[in-house]
A protein has these predicted regions:
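Short, surface-exposed "cap/lid" segments of acyl-processing enzymes
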Residues: 41-81
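Alpha/beta-hydrolase active-site loop
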Residues: 72-73, 101-127
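Conserved alpha/beta-hydrolase
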Residues: 74-99
Length: 252
């Protein structure tokens, strides 16, 4: 009986993070920005993730689950059974597709796009009253870099995963920065050597709260190398969310 009671108590304590789509208004815009939120039970920080590709997921109010890369790499950050469970996770959804460009996705520096990121940052900072971190994956890393170049005081940390070549971060940025790449990433636009050179420049300028993590597990998929497999941490999801969680909680 005691064992049954203990198991029942454990089940009650391990409660999944609340998940929902939250609409964030943008003054002057005809439509809000849809976001997907995993709300941690004991959140200490907010992590807002800007997706790669064309940045448009098609989120709609009423949705309570999000799978794929988002559910397997980001969702666990709000789950105490898998990580510290102390991060509220937000996935940003552009209301329209953002052209990927050929050499640099200039759409990621567009006024409407950056204004939407700012409104989402301010919305969740007000909602939770916690430090807000930004994470960008692939093309989304460009969005994060462009945003913090203009609004460094609104951000408390940044994570660049599988980032597209061309991302720049100024040494004057005071908050912690993590770069995350898979060693076997076959996406031509995501050259980790670019980020390694950037880290060398940042450290040479005296920045110490910057780190680079290689992922080595996982497996490829028979799909586009920039939308699957190693680039999306397929099979290495646990290594990815553990690395992210360890970096974020190091700055609690």
């Amino acid at each position: 009986m005691r064992l049954i009671a203990a198991l029942a108590l454990a089940c009650l304590l391990v409660v999944p993070a609340r998940a929902e789509v939250v609409s964030v208004p943008l003054p002057g815009a005809s439509e809000p920005t849809q976001t997907f939120l995993w709300e941690a039970k004991a959140g200490k920080k907010v992590l807002i993730m800007i997706p790669g590709g064309e940045g448009h997921l098609g989120l709609a109010p009423g949705r309570t689950s999000l799978g794929g890369f988002y559910g397997s790499v980001l969702g666990p950050l709000a789950e105490s059974a898998l990580t510290s469970g102390t991060t509220h996770v937000v996935v940003f959804d552009s209301p329209h597709a953002l052209p990927v460009g050929t050499t640099y996705p200039v759409s990621r520096a567009g006024a409407d796009h950056l204004a939407r990121i700012e409104s989402v940052v301010r919305f969740y900072k007000a909602r939770f009253g916690k430090p807000v971190w930004l994470m960008g994956h692939s093309n989304g890393a460009v969005s994060v870099a462009e945003f913090i170049r203009r609004n460094p005081d609104l951000v408390d940390g940044a994570i660049f995963s599988s980032s597209r070549s061309g991302v720049q971060v100024a040494p004057s940025v005071s908050f912690p920065v993590l770069f995350l790449h898979h060693q076997l990433d076959g996406c031509a636009g995501a050259d980790p050597r670019s980020d390694l050179r950037l880290i060398d420049q940042l450290r040479a300028a005296g920045k110490r709260n910057v780190s680079f993590v290689w992922l080595r597990g996982g497996s490829p998929e028979q799909k586009s190398p920039c939308a699957s497999g190693y680039h999306m941490f397929f099979g290495a999801e646990a290594d990815a969310f553990k690395a992210i969680d360890a970096f974020i909680t190091a700055y609690d």
